[in-house]
A protein has these predicted regions:
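Short aromatic-glycine-(Arg/Gly/Cys) micro-motifs in beta-strand/loop hairpins
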Residues: 1-12
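A general, composition-driven signal for non-globular sequence regions
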Residues: 1-3, 19, 36
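A short, exposed loop/beta-hairpin motif centered on an aromatic-Gly-Thr core
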Residues: 11-20
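Short, mixed-charge low-complexity intrinsically disordered segments
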Residues: 30-46
């Protein structure tokens, strides 16, 4: 598992643990509002 900082338009930055970037995006999509969108995904150094 890696840590990813996922920046969204309305909710700011959400940090999630995921196996890869795609999985991190999927996890965030489940919790943000339907009108929100992901701006960037960045892997955090441990």
């Amino acid at each position: 598992m890696k840590q990813y900082a996922v920046q969204t338009k309305f909710n700011g930055t959400i940090v999630v643990s995921a196996i890869d970037e795609f999985n991190a995006e999927e996890l965030v999509i489940e919790v943000i509002a339907s009108d929100d969108e992901i701006i960037s995904v960045q892997e955090l150094d441990m």
